[in-house]
């Protein structure tokens, strides 16, 4: 009861409803323990009004401010004086030299804009601590630290860009990736998020990749490994006269490495392993995530890894024919030592014409004719085995190998054999002479920051995309590389990955529903603007600093933009420019796209520009919904490394308050329904339709939205699906639809659970299965 009266006073003072309350005096009368209790108490009241969560966040910020330095330079000075300081001397020197500018520009009041989940995430993961675990900086200090790392650590201190980047970060217009946030300004600034490794079939390289992955993970990077080149189990090893163990024991070894090499001590290590479907060990691979009992006791499972399938068009064609009884689904299995290079070729075209450029199909059937196969199965049997596992653990992911390669600006560099931890990064990588290990630096733009009453500010989005492009390009030069092969790859291709978050917030603010023609058009236009802004700035940077070394021969060097590759493949109609011009109200016209093509021929700074990653941490910090996803629920608890937090859909609450419907009765019905409003008939049908959760909407809607935005994505996207029941037919429907529409990602996670209306839990847990595992490429 005491908490209730204190909270009532605090709420009145905070929101200006009781001017006779001295907020500072009231807070100073409370000790640390009492304030922590109030934070928990306020958080529990979120179901009544999201302002309680806001109040809890402000109390948490107040508590942090009481124990940290009151100026940026002082915070840096205190950290530098620590015996085990992580800060680099160069960074400290820059801060001391320009401390008057930094101290006067930083705005600590912006810390109070963070959500409760945001401030707790910052405290747990991003803010620098001393050796005893005591937090030494505030969120604004972290934003300034990142800005200085990006624009102040080179030969020239670009003060204008430092302050602009700080401003964009602190106002939550943009966010940078987790490794950038917690490693910026330190002695070993590994700022990159995603790493791609290709494992060769020799003992030395097999163990080298264990070491490399562990080193990368220790610096905060997430890892994707291609295993398609490893010979199958029982294959003969001529050098020793023995038989191969295949991929299973190696996967177990990488699983152990991941568990040991956590990400900078801040969160668990995170690896994903990829395999092509023709590999003899494919069934073993598909079973490993779910092995239990005796197999688990013998340590033949690897439950901590993520798994991904690299799926060629040929398999999808055979699968579709088998589904529709047009063929028997025969699928041949090979060991790469007997049938080499299948993972190194792809089909440039999807045409069935005999003269079509289909190198994978040609080589596959050549090996069949030569009887090099070691097993025979059917496409259905493989997909059924995949489904058994995906129902239990949500993955293996599905990446469409040929679509990824034929739509890559870097297809001339080499075949893309795998993706990263969250299947949105697609960089060629290989071992051997002049080895390259793929690297990508990530950031994301807050789409909700550009809502202007009932319209959208595409010009602002274009400008922000340009600023992020320059930031990420600098990170390539200023970051630490764990291996020479990672440095070589990043310097040669200079790939960046700009993502988004808050798309659902945009639709809610504009009172649109997912799947409507208007929403799909805006989705397309937003990602067109994002790509345009990034490409425009990359071209400008090329004029200033030079193109990336692998630019000659790239699609851009021939005047082909990312959507042009989709048009060439027949997956996008040529009139897309007119459609985007109409949606953006003339901001992006066909003429501007042609000017961009002509300029690109002269040079582009970055081989890749956009990639749509999960953004749980950014969403947590800013109170916006994750990446391009619909709302998972209108009320749920979010479990993170920072604890559990109640999340209430503020847009729904505002809409219901607007029509005087937000009441205790509605709150209770929302609780009873597990966050769904579909059966609360007092709520108008139009609002119920707009606030369908990700599971309640037809999953084809998610595929159609993905198809609208994918042509403007340089790499790929972390595309989730949500189903009530584990029915293979439903999953196949969206996978085949996505493949036919030319998507690069078939699926990231597939979530299955009973519908909200059938659950009687008070609050349903958020289904972010990847949250604790995949945060390396989360923002």
UniProtKB/Swiss-Prot annotation:
One of its GO terms (molecular function) is ribonucleoside-diphosphate reductase activity, thioredoxin disulfide as acceptor. GO terms for biological process: deoxyribonucleotide biosynthetic process. The active site is at 420 (proton acceptor), 422 (cysteine radical intermediate), 424 (proton acceptor). The record marks 201, 231 as: Allosteric effector binding. The record marks 774, 777 as: Interacts with thioredoxin/glutaredoxin. Disulfide bonds join 194-440. Substrate binds at residues 178, 193-194, 222, 420-424, 614-618. Under complex allosteric control mediated by deoxynucleoside triphosphates and ATP binding. The type of nucleotide bound at the specificity site determines substrate preference. It seems probable that ATP makes the enzyme reduce CDP and UDP, dGTP favors ADP reduction and dTTP favors GDP reduction. The record marks 748-749 as: Important for electron transfer. Induction: Expressed in the early phase of the viral replicative cycle. The record marks 194, 440 as: Important for hydrogen atom transfer. Belongs to the ribonucleoside diphosphate reductase large chain family. Heterotetramer composed of a homodimer of the large subunit (R1) and a homodimer of the small subunit (R2). Larger multisubunit protein complex are also active, composed of (R1)n(R2)n. This is Ribonucleoside-diphosphate reductase large subunit. The lineage of its organism: Viruses, Varidnaviria, Bamfordvirae, Nucleocytoviricota, Pokkesviricetes.
